Regions:
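A glycine/proline-hinged amphipathic helix-loop "lid/cap" segment
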Residues: 1-81
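Alpha/beta-hydrolase superfamily serine-hydrolase fold, recognizing
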Residues: 31, 62-204
Length: 204
């Protein structure tokens, strides 16, 4: 839907969404969650992956996929030489039911460009095929991988958007409950913090 932009002393003019935002809106508007079938969900997942692979600006960046304990993962790095003393562990969004490595490229690229830091993205298992705590277990596996590489907990920025923000928070709580060191920082973008969807911001 076109937005309206107003100028002082003038008539409103239509402000159209950028092509990428139109595609993103279309992908996430394929079907209402209440009526989404398994086929609809698979279609949305494939579309997200294709959109992410198409949209991520990779100039000056290197995308390095690898396997992490049976789970797909990838590094986003600057192409030029740089110090690797700190790292970002990025948890993608998607309502715990969609999203993946291809879709992760968009924000991983932005994070690397903005900070100069390497970003580790991982393809955690999705619901409904893999219910809780599968995603948390995969998040901890990614965290443990960074520790095995020699990063200290305080060297890690734990980042996530939407459901990925929830995953980042739950991972922190799990680390704390186990008496382990917590990350140096949290970077949460519109995190899903109300899993019951009963808060005033949703019901008021």
């Amino acid at each position: 839907m076109a937005k309206k932009k107003y100028k002082l002393g003038g008539e409103p003019e239509e402000l159209k969404l950028a092509p990428f935002m139109r595609l993103l809106k279309a992908v996430h508007s394929m079907q209402e969650p209440e009526t989404m079938t398994t086929a609809d969900l698979e279609k949305q997942r494939r579309s997200q992956e294709a959109l992410g692979n198409m949209a991520a600006a990779m100039s000056g960046l290197v995308w390095e996929p690898f396997e992490l304990g049976g789970m797909d993962a990838a590094w986003m790095r600057l192409e030029r030489p740089h110090k690797r003393r700190r790292v970002i562990l990025y948890c993608h969004g998607g309502g715990y039911t969609s999203g993946g490595l291809g879709f992760s490229k968009v924000l991983a690229a932005k994070l690397t460009r903005a900070t100069g830091m390497d970003v580790l993205a991982f393809d955690y298992r999705l619901a409904p095929e893999h219910p809780y705590p599968a995603a948390i277990e995969d998040g901890q596996a990614a965290w443990d991988h960074l520790m095995q590489l020699g990063f200290g907990a305080r060297d890690v920025v734990l980042a996530g958007d939407s459901a990925g923000g929830n995953l980042a928070l739950v991972l922190c709580l799990k680390l704390r409950s186990e008496g382990r060191m917590l990350p140096g920082a949290l970077l949460l973008m519109s995190p899903w913090t109300d899993m019951s969807c009963s808060g005033e911001s949703l019901t008021g």
